[in-house]
Swiss-Prot record:
Its main location: mitochondrion. SMART domains: Elp3. InterPro entries: Aldolase_TIM, Elp3/MiaA/NifB-like_rSAM, LIAS_N, Lipoyl_synth, rSAM. Its cofactor is [4Fe-4S] cluster. Transmembrane segments: none annotated. Gene3D superfamilies: Aldolase class I (3.20.20.70). It is found in: Mitochondrion. HAMAP family: Lipoyl_synth. Belongs to the radical SAM superfamily. Lipoyl synthase family. It comes from Candida tropicalis (strain ATCC MYA-3404 / T1) (Yeast). This is Lipoyl synthase, mitochondrial. The keyword NAD does not apply. Its EC number is 2.8.1.8.
Length: 377
């Protein structure tokens, strides 16, 4: 006979047995604590979570009473000069990085006196083939073909404005065989034909690492060759388009200098991505090793919610520190401040003076010892 054993033995104290096997509760982790501080399920249902997760700059755009670092506040663009520059830009069908990149200094640069008002013209259209996580310029794999009249129109606009110094920048055009290098060179040549006295700075791309294209632009007649590193080496893969590398950008600046040693070479760094002091120092050393003359520091400001969040709003005092540090390392000129941008005009007067002295072979130009703070903060 088969004996049948009950499935459950009622004599066993089930509850007590389960209780004795319960492990002690784990300590809360840092992640859990931070998660509990954030929005709850009810916040998401009510719609409050969205506001709880926005950074101060985003909130300030919606709520005038929200806290925003005072050094990041700028005046509303207005004035006769501002509207005149805007009119010329529209009439000649030009693009400007001032508008496309939502530059905070547009009211100062466009709204200055006639001798000071300027716009940084963006060549090769208003659409980039790359998609860096900090940039608000439109992107597309196949932008419209470059306007063949753009070099002539650009030269005409610059002649109208009566400038002594002009900055040209460009979108990346990986869809073009030469990356747009010859178009940029032609624009510089047209400007020099119409107004030989004008000093020209070009903020160019990396041409996919084709250094022959760098040489074409360097030999076009420009006076300042600028190419931006944007950030430190460790953060580059997370911030810039994957086709742009830190070492490739250094190679561009180095080749430009070797091609024409009289050129002033220039680059810019944005702070606020979470970079460390050690990483910034390493970047400055790398730049000095390749003979880069000018560096600028500015605060990264998130253009839209689709872009990288700001990790830190760097104080004006910290920007002063990096200005002094870079000057001590031997840079010819340094512009450093929350609202400074790569094409910001704060340094142009000094660079213009340096270049004019070089044109007239007036010995060695001494390095600038003191740089005035930009008036925008």
């Amino acid at each position: 006979m088969i004996s049948r054993t009950p499935l459950f033995r009622t004599s066993i104290p089930i509850q007590r047995t389960l209780a004795t096997n319960v492990k002690p509760r784990r300590k809360r982790t840092v992640f859990t604590d931070e998660l509990n501080k954030g929005p709850s399920f009810e916040d998401f249902v009510s719609g409050k979570a969205k506001d709880m997760m926005e950074d101060p700059l985003e909130l300030a755009r919606k709520d005038p009473n929200a806290k925003l670092p005072k050094w990041l506040k700028v005046p509303i663009p207005k004035g006769k000069s501002f509207h005149n520059v805007k009119k010329d830009v529209r009439e000649l069908k030009l693009s400007t990085v001032c508008e496309e990149a939502k530059c905070p200094n547009i009211s100062e640069c466009w709204g200055g006196k006639k001798s000071e008002a300027t716009a940084t013209i963006m060549l090769l259209g208003d659409t980039c083939t790359r998609g860096c996580r900090f940039c608000s310029v439109k992107t597309n794999r196949k932008p419209a073909a470059p306007d063949p009249n753009e070099p002539e129109n650009t030269a005409e606009a610059i002649k109208r404005w009566g400038l002594g110094y002009v900055v040209l920048t460009t979108v990346d055009r990986d869809d073009l065989v030469d990356g747009g290098a010859r178009h940029l060179a032609e624009t510089v040549e047209k400007i020099k034909q119409k107004a030989p006295q004008i000093l020209v700075e070009v903020l160019g791309g990396d041409f996919r690492g084709d250094l022959d294209m760098v040489e074409i632009l360097a030999n076009s007649g420009l006076d300042v060759y600028a190419h931006n590193l944007e950030t430190v080496e460790d953060l580059t893969p997370h911030i810039r388009d994957r086709r742009a590398t830190y070492r490739q950008s250094l190679a561009v600046l180095e080749r430009a200098k070797k091609t024409k040693p009289s050129l002033v070479t220039k680059t810019s760094l944005m702070l606020g991505f979470g970079e460390t002091d050690e990483q910034i120092m390493k970047t400055l050393k790398d730049l000095r090793e390749i003979g880069c003359d000018v560096v600028t520091f500015g605060q990264y400001m998130r253009p839209t919610k689709r872009h990288m969040k700001v990790v830190e709003y760097v104080t004006p005092e910290k920007f002063d520190y990096w200005r002094d540090t870079a000057l001590d390392m031997g840079f010819l000129y340094v512009a450093s401040g929350p609202l400074v941008r790569s094409s910001y005009k704060a340094g142009e007067a000094f660079i213009e003076n340096v270049l004019k002295k070089r044109r007239h072979n007036v010995g060695e130009t001494p390095r600038l010892q003191s740089v005035a703070k930009p008036s925008v903060y």
